[in-house]
Amino acid sequence: MALKHFLNTQDWSCSELNALLTQARAFKHNKLGNGLKGKSIALVFFNASMRTRSSFELGAFQLGGHAIVLQPGKDAWPIEFDTGTVMEAETEEHICEVARVLGHYVDLIGVRAFPKFLDWTYDRQDIVLNGFAKYSPVPVINMETITHPCQELAHIMALQEHFGTTDLRGKKYVLTWTYHPKPLNTAVANSALTIATRLGMDVTLLCPTPDYVLDERYIDWAQQNIADTGSTFQVSHDIDNAYRGADVIYAKSWGALPFFGNWAMEKPIRDQYRHFIVDEAKMALTNNAVFSHCLPLRRNVKATDAVMDGPNCIAIHEAGNRLHVQKAIMAALASQ
């Protein structure tokens, strides 16, 4: 039987994802368990984290396990991922050794590694995550690279709790780009598009121009998913039409893929679209929609105080669910 990793949700069947969500709900009501008793996880962070690190460390503890945190280039040696490289630069060891050695010590490995933002054709290969998955003898969990599947499940769990049902088919789901002064990762947007179409929601991707449409891989996944579920997917640049009648507004900012490595040219374009902020006027067009965001969020840049503090905002609940879904993921993978 092939080793099962948690790299993205598209690799897992709907029944497997539903089982994870069912287990996550159980953990939410009874936080302690023994799914990691006597086991350990290495959490490898190439980028900063608050919610991900704290929820994974605490989750491992609550399951009776132990987590160690490694930050290559800070408290651990810099790692090389390219093959055939003459390692005369700053990297001290290669992933083919790192992953295999860690696999002798721990039972799971979590990886968080953002794009370099210089060349999307390179970044989309996700070489850090895939390098760990290729060489690791133990299951690997994606803690956010170019997708964020843990956030996906926490988001869906929060939506199911809000609507009081696990069946989200037919909900109008709007994934909206929002302004941010810096170009950000597309990971959460890629994941939101994937899971929303997978679960049969009618999805609108709202963004300022075609340059902000997500990578074709995730557009293709969305098209495959709606073919399976009978739901719909469209890209829109019209704010009012996108918001009108929506049941879910999910906000995220991301950099335009054609400008990777040339952000000075992208910034004046992005600066024209500050009006994509989620505010009360836009929310008034919806079907009393629920609003969420993965956090962190710059208030009154991405969404107004009134939206964030309003009764329909579930961003805090979504973030809280990270603990429960990650415990479910760790327990499932550790039981292989």
Curated annotation (Swiss-Prot):
Q: Which InterPro entries match?
A: ArgF (IPR043695), Asp/Orn_carbamoyltranf_P-bd (IPR006132), Asp/Orn_carbamoylTrfase (IPR006130), Asp/Orn_carbamoylTrfase_sf (IPR036901), Asp_carbamoyltransf_Asp/Orn-bd (IPR006131)
Name the UniProt key words of this record, in alphabetical order: Amino-acid biosynthesis, Arginine biosynthesis, Cytoplasm, Transferase
Molecular functions (GO terms): amino acid binding; N-acetylornithine carbamoyltransferase activity; ornithine carbamoyltransferase activity
Q: Does the keyword Transferase apply?
A: yes
SUPFAM superfamilies registered for this protein in UniProt: Aspartate/ornithine carbamoyltransferase
List modified residues, type N6-carboxylysine.
K302
Protein task? Catalyzes the transfer of the carbamoyl group from carbamoyl phosphate to the delta-amino group of N(2)-acetyl-L-ornithine to produce N(2)-acetyl-L-citrulline. This is a step in an alternative arginine biosynthesis pathway. The enzyme has no activity with ornithine.
Q: Which PANTHER family match?
A: ORNITHINE CARBAMOYLTRANSFERASE, MITOCHONDRIAL (PTHR45753), ORNITHINE TRANSCARBAMYLASE, MITOCHONDRIAL (PTHR45753:SF3)
Tell me the protein's name: N-acetylornithine carbamoyltransferase
**Species, as recorded:** Xylella fastidiosa (strain 9a5c)
